[in-house]
Amino acid sequence: MSEFDPKNKYTPFERINLKDRKWPNQIINNAPTWCSVDLRDGNQSLIEPMDTPKKLKLFKTLVSMGFKEIEIGFPAASETDYNFCRYLIENKLIPNDVTIQVLTQAREHLIDNTFEALIGCNSAIVHLYNSVSTLQRKVVFKQDRIGVKNIALDGAKYILNKLDKFDEGVIKLQYSPESFTGTELDYALEVCEEVLDCWKANQKNPVIINLPATVEMSTPNIYADQIEWMSNNFSNRDRVILSLHPHNDRGTGVAATELALMAGADRVEGTLFGNGERTGNVDIVTLGLNMFTQGVDPKLDFKDLNQLIETAEFCTQLPVHQRHPYAGSLVHTAFSGSHQDAIRKGMEAISKSNQEKWEVPYLPIDPSDIGKTYEAIIRVNSQSGKAGSAWLLEQDHNIFLPRGAQIQFSQSVQKLADSSGKEITSQIIWDIFEKEYLFEGKYKLINFSSKKLSRNNSKELVEATISYNNENIDISASGNGPISAFVTAMREKFNLIFRLSDFSQNTRSSGSTAEAAAYVEIRVPDENGRSVFGVGIDTSITLAPIKAVISAINRI
């Protein structure tokens, strides 16, 4: 590539002469009007276009999400699209508050077929388009500015004559100067204004002017400048519903749309998960959830994102990428040790404070708001630290290891992760935990009992039977509570040198078969004064810590 100079082949996009641009200081505080084009733009890009059952399934999904405008096809260009349009109308499958949209080019016979397909509908948008860009005028149409403008006006006039066959207000009109971003702004404005005049647009009956980034050609700020320039220069802005139709050729379709909304747009056409020609249309799911995470109601229902993914994948036969914003299966997953630690602490803080505001590091959205679970937030591999294995023990098994035990235990997990090079699942972590703490060592608890020495005395007497080297040995001692007494008995009988330095306990489940998990830390007086941890699990809150002491002693 170093020998190739791209400027000899490619021309950079020119800046827009927009003085005192306002969009950089604006914020998005309301959802736009959304129009799904999954059934047209999305469908035409598929290797195997959707059949009627799949189209119907997707249409019903879009309706249930809250879309009020849905482009259902190009009836005059495809028998399948025509039949689908008629099927929806004749079977009364279009809710009263939903407007269907159909696409047509500026040719009389196509317009005739389009209006024929709409007979009997309650509300529809007829979307007229023709390409007006400099390149297409030169290469495709071989016409000058006047010739291409007349294509739009001829189509607009012909459509106007069709409206008297429908009740007033049933048909709404939309015009797109296709390839808008490759068109001189003054010319795009000229064509749009004359179409608006032809259709007698006014504040009471506005026309949708849709400005497509048919091919994304520049950085997002350029598109925002173009939209603000157009918005500022319409002779009567009140008669225009300014719509966006961005594509994602440069990978910045979402950003371009957001900036263009800040620049004054009212409406967005896009698809679920960005399906569409080439690199796709703008992704309405990402756009909507970006708004949601800024405290803005997107007016679309994303609360069961997994079901939405399943439907989209079934209908399009295209997978949603694992790293797709919000939707991907790995989006809410952390493998990095530092990330896991921050997430775990953030989740603990949220739980303890009961605050409504969502503030968790590395998680811009609460997964539960989109129907995701917390199970996959943290997963463990060779890049993970102590927080990952500790989180999985806590979430899946209600085991809350003390911090020191977390560090020691994570080393065992890390060793396996390094040697295998694979993900360490929750079940594998539990298996490691059992081998570390719940194994049968040389000391085994056979029997245990405790009783208070007297009513007025806090001391207790414990009596236990320990299996040691296959021999049952009875032990007993008194102390301030059963744990202290048992530690004393073990030290005295087996000449063990250690001291109990910490103890904690939690319930693992509720009900008549509830289990308790106990954790002890003992200090061994070797040259490092090391800590050894033990864990005990039992339905008895008295026996669980006794088993934890045995576990720790077996691990010395």
Question: Whereabouts are the PLM-identified features?
Answer:
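A conserved regulatory-domain signal marking ACT and ACT-like small-molecule sensing domains
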Residues: 454-460, 467-470, 476-530, 539-540
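Short beta-alpha connecting loops at secondary-structure transitions
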Residues: 136-139, 211-213, 269-277, 289-301, ...
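Alpha/beta enzyme core
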Residues: 3-4, 8-10, 34, 50-69, ...
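Catalytic alpha/beta core domains of metabolic enzymes, predominantly
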Residues: 215-352
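Short, small-residue-enriched loops and turns at beta-alpha junctions
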Residues: 41, 45-46, 75-79, 133-135, ...
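A mid-to-C-terminal "edge-of-domain" accessory segment
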Residues: 2-38, 295-476, 512-515
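N-terminal capping/small domains of soluble enzymes
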Residues: 1-108, 372, 377-380, 384, ...
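Mixed-charge, glycine-accented linear interaction segment located at domain edges/termini
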Residues: 529-556
